[in-house]
């Protein structure tokens, strides 16, 4: 099982620098994946709780990190439920937490997961084994809602014609798999408008994956829970791979680090509020040229972090 889930952790050195793992610290890896980030934290003496809703990832990471014994604990859960997980474990907070967002390389490579358009696979796209599959989503929503998803989550300029073509195929009961869906999407986009560096279905597949897994909702819940999840002095780090995620992280972290809650048109602060968080990264940290050369997936990764100061 563990051999099926080999994943190169991005920005590994930077994550260690931000979270400062050390003996006595308890850290929460909200997106355990193959266990790469957690292993780095354990190697430096920290205790780690790893969350993942993908049973394959959980099994692989558990096998990989078994040598750490009681210092590591794996929990099958969505990182959006971090606060509830800690409560169930009898914990009031952690000294650091990390999420590495998006889909992992093993999930993309396993055709039966339905994430990739390079090989035929079922219309699934669930990161776990619960919830609505992509096929069910496409049958349930109408063309207008599908276009909205493609436009908002994929920033797809041809959302309307793509939605029309996809719904036509779904409603005709055509036998669809990921490869056929990608072909339908590509043909709905004028050939001269095809992106130069990515497959024409890339944005659509991203949008559908986000919708199936409610990824932005999960991220919002994790961000909203940080004040209750972190101990004073604890740090939160988020690695994002597209603008929607990064924008949400940036805006929420900025709000956490701002003290004054007065209306912007008030000339003098009257609330007397003090910020409970401080920025650790003034701007997004990106991968080095060397890391990108070794792991091209790291090219779009952005790391942001804050610390709870009171």
UniProtKB/Swiss-Prot annotation:
Q: Work out whether the entry's keyword set contains Signal.
A: no
Gene3D superfamilies according to UniProt: Putative methyltransferase TM0872, insert domain, Vaccinia Virus protein VP39
A Gene Ontology molecular-function term? rRNA (cytosine-N4-)-methyltransferase activity
| Residue sites binding S-adenosyl-L-methionine per the record | 35-37, 52, 79, 100, 107
Q: Please verify whether the record's keywords include Glycoprotein.
A: no
What's one Pfam family here?
A: Methyltransf_5
Describe its function: Specifically methylates the N4 position of cytidine in position 1402 (C1402) of 16S rRNA.
PANTHER family, per the entry: 12S RRNA N4-METHYLCYTIDINE METHYLTRANSFERASE, S-ADENOSYL-METHYLTRANSFERASE MRAW
User: Family assignment?
Assistant: Belongs to the methyltransferase superfamily. RsmH family.
Query: What's the protein here called?
Result: Ribosomal RNA small subunit methyltransferase H
- Taxonomic lineage: Bacteria, Pseudomonadati, Myxococcota, Myxococcia, Myxococcales
Q: What is the gene called? A: rsmH
């Amino acid at each position: 099982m563990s051999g099926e889930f080999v994943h190169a952790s991005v920005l590994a050195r930077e994550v260690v620098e931000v979270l400062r793992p050390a003996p006595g610290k308890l850290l929460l890896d909200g997106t355990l994946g193959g266990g790469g980030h957690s292993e780095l934290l354990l190697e430096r003496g920290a205790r780690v709780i790893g969350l993942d809703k993908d049973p394959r990832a959980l099994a692989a990471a558990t096998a990989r990190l078994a040598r750490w014994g009681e210092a590591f604990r794996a929990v099958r859960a969505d990182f959006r439920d971090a606060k509830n997980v800690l409560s169930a474990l009898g914990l009031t907070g952690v000294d650091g937490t990390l999420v590495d967002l998006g889909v992992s390389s093993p999930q993309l490579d396993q055709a039966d997961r339905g994430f990739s358009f390079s090989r035929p696979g079922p219309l699934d796209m669930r990161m776990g084994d619960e919830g609505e599959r992509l096929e069910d989503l496409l049958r349930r929503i109408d063309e207008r809602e599908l276009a909205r998803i493609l436009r908002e989550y994929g920033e797809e300029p041809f959302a309307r014609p793509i939605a029309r073509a996809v719904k036509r195929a779904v409603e005709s009961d055509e036998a669809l798999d990921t490869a056929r869906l990608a072909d339908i999407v590509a043909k709905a986009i004028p050939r001269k408008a095809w992106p130069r560096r990515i497959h024409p279905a890339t944005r659509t597949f991203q949008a559908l994956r986000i919708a199936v897994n409610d990824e932005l909702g999960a991220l919002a819940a994790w961000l909203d829970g940080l004040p209750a999840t972190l101990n004073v002095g604890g740090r939160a780090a988020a690695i994002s791979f597209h603008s929607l995620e990064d924008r949400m992280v940036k805006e929420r972290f900025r709000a956490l680090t701002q003290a004054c809650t007065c209306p912007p048109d008030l000339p003098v602060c009257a609330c007397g509020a003090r910020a409970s968080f401080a920025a650790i990264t003034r701007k997004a940290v990106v991968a080095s040229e060397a890391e990108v050369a070794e792991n091209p997936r790291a090219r779009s990764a952005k790391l942001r972090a804050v610390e709870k100061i009171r």
